[in-house]
Amino acid sequence: MYMKRKKAVSVLTALVTAFTVFQNSVGNVSAMFGSTLHDTGNVEITINTDKEINRISSYIYGINDSCSLADVEVTAVKQKGNSLSSYNWETNAANFGADGDYISSNELVSAFSKNVMNTPGLYTKNLLDKAKLYDIPAQYVTLQMMGYAANDALGVVNPGEDRRWAEVRFNKTDDLLIYPDINDDIVYMDEYVSYLVNSAGFASDGGINGYFLDSEPESWTERYAILDIDSLTAAELVSRSAQLAKSVKSVDPSAMVLGPSVSGIESYVNLKNEDDWRNYKETYSWFIDYYLDNMRMASDKNGKRLLDVLDLHFFTEAKSALLEPVISTDTKFANEERMQAVRVLWDSNYTENSATARLYKQHTPIIPMLQASIRMYYPDTKLSFSEYNFGGGNNISGGIAQADVLGVFGREGVYMACLSPDGDDISFQKTAINLYRDYDGDGSSFGDVSVYADNGGDVMSSVYASVESDDASALRTVLINKNMTSKKTALVSISSHNVYHSAKVYSFGGNSSDIVSESAVENIENNSFEFEMQPLTVYMLEFETEEIMQEETVVTENTDEILTEETVSDVSEETAAEESVTITSAESEKMPESSSEKEEESSQSVSSDSAEEGKVTEVTVVSEGTDVSESSTAVISSQESDIETEGSVSVSEKEPDDTDEPAKVPMAVKVIVCMLVAAVVIVMIYVVITDFILAHKKK
């Protein structure tokens, strides 16, 4: 029965893939000859500094330690590597599994001389040293939960060589040693944490901030097949997680525990074990719910919280119109899809172009779904993406996607996130981080409070806005033009008790990953202005006030919790009514509401589908008393015609390569291509079904 079910799932996946091929090929036949996304024109930007969304965690600007940290201003760093599940902290040996021909070695500490390679915890000490060198405030370490660690560094391990593996135990019944016994063939996790506390201090005293409960445990069976490990079940993962978390808390109660660190939507849904998931799918909508609920129950039983952060890995599975994997391809089609792929995290109107996303569409957009699960099953648990990547680190599309996702993480209340870079050149991704963390080279950064910002529904642009918790007038705004070839004029309207008269401008785009200072915005009148954006460019606007009216913002002391506010102002209701503007509320539909998070809601909407070419819709003035949903900061999809407005800020134009307009293709050619593709898909479906029938008969 298991094989039949597994075969049926394979057939279903193949059919979804075939349908995706057909849909993309027929629906976007012109993509074979030109762009699949069209440039859009003017965009209306509405910002309201008095509508605070949440506190932005400083830890979202993190990175994995697999790249140089010298030229990027990050706030968190973590260990990365597929071999971490088998890392032996006592000797620094690790086995690289099927990805590395099952070689056990000291590769993780290869930068050190041989006489110190066996120093206990050297790999982690190296992480702490780098964090200190580059002034990175938060460090996170991965613990081992698989049950086996490399027992030597002598090369390829063959099946049956049990002596070459050390047993991993979570708790040591004897005293925890300052220096471990490397000859007992056992590696203790509580002793590992104790060793790190002795050398670096408790988390509350500046030591290691948190510990991951292994890394991508759903892949143990495949990655370490020679160990003959059974497929991981949901119950087994929770059991091990609770035991290891208890060990961590017993040694360092102030350290955070993060898990389950599984990767991809399929893992979120069923832990990549559909057969086991049948036992729970009637009770829980996806594995995330099961994990949170059972970790909560384990915490209640133990009298202490055992999971502080719901941690996940996310690597885009999106494919271009030509079915190229976006994460590892930098063609024109992959680049334009990459700049849209971030929307799978928050936008219910977007479907990632992948078989997995289509199969599990009901579990997207991802962040609102995860937050709803947290509220339902384990309230006050934080959310992190300790490994993520949208690719394109060596070109502007990757820089735009990176700038976009950082804005999303801040706006959506993510606690911690670490870019997991791929390739030697990730200069554009690093620049995107630096734009938020040090845009002027003098330490100036995006604010720590997210405020309302909306772009009227334009999928070819994004906007994010912030103020400081101790300075409500310190408005910073990120604007992004995703148009491949066209300039875009942003018509910006700011609703605020502050009057802004100018804005400094910083940007990167085109073929350059350097942040440059542009001409300042000087044409702000009544908190409104027009701003011209070059194609494929990201901007940071630092606003300066003309007159700051008395205002005090009171926030919670916990910088990681959702913000609660009380605004005191001596501005008259008449003045406030004149300054406020209409805003759209798009995200109220995409994110489940919590009664503790919202008291007011607005369902105002603006449709841009009927906008005529060359026409700009005026912003409607409303009274200050208009209710606005706190969660309505989504950047939703729409399209407007291309418009270029003169008199806007002059910025040096950076034209990307391959921007010529595609030649029109005769309809007859398109029809022929459609027919050919349809024929191929039909053959694919026939082959899959035939294979299934034959296999069934053989059974």
PLM regions and their residue ranges:
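Noncatalytic carbohydrate-binding groove/subsite architecture in carbohydrate-active enzymes
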Residues: 188-195, 200, 234-397, 402
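C-terminal membrane-anchoring or membrane-association module
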Residues: 679-699
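C-terminal low-complexity, Ser/Thr- and acidic/Pro-rich disordered "stalk" regions positioned immediately N-terminal
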Residues: 555-668
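Glycan-recognition and catalytic regions of carbohydrate-active enzymes
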Residues: 395, 402, 406-476, 512, ...
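N-terminal substrate-binding region of glycoside hydrolase catalytic domains
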Residues: 38, 44-191, 217-233
